[in-house]
């Protein structure tokens, strides 16, 4: 009988999770805080979260508040870290340039229009990233065109007519408002079914 009691008392071994030294995440400029998800990720690696947030917010002071920045944090064994802040995410830059808030909802939907000149300027910004330093601008532009296609942004190889673009954006805003209303109605109907 004693062996059964000892088996019950014996606790399961606690398995310690070892996290990697590199943490890759997107953090909004000037908005780093100890709240989830960033705080727990840093705490698990033994970093002082408050000091990290203070340093990150100070270093991103020249960015507009809320801009998503890809960040690489390399944690050293003595609990210090190297912080690498990249340029804003490609999708954010493309959406800002096209003046849209969200990507396409269906396969063949066009949500915005950009010219090759816009893509060239964005490519010059992205070429400052460590990962794209030795990549030619032409190749970066091709990657941006593929991302535009994924988001539903139409790439024009000639200048955009301002009147035509304004009409497109007004029609697009009406369509997005209708889509959001439809989604809200579906969500409300689903909530009514579950109660």
Swiss-Prot record:
InterPro entries named in the record: Ribosomal_uL11, Ribosomal_uL11_C, Ribosomal_uL11_C_sf, Ribosomal_uL11_N, Ribosomal_uL11_N_sf
Signal peptide: none
A family per Pfam: Ribosomal_L11
GO molecular function: large ribosomal subunit rRNA binding; structural constituent of ribosome
GO BP, one annotated term: translation
GO cellular component, one term: mitochondrial large ribosomal subunit
Compartments where found: Mitochondrion
Record key words, sorted: Mitochondrion, Ribonucleoprotein, Ribosomal protein, Transit peptide
Family note: Belongs to the universal ribosomal protein uL11 family.
Quaternary data: Component of the mitochondrial ribosome large subunit (39S) which comprises a 16S rRNA and about 50 distinct proteins.
Classification via PANTHER family: 60S RIBOSOMAL PROTEIN L12 (PTHR11661), LARGE RIBOSOMAL SUBUNIT PROTEIN UL11M (PTHR11661:SF1)
HAMAP family from the UniProt entry: Ribosomal_uL11
Name the record gives this protein: Large ribosomal subunit protein uL11m
Source lineage: Eukaryota, Metazoa, Ecdysozoa, Nematoda, Chromadorea
Gene coding for it: mrpl-11
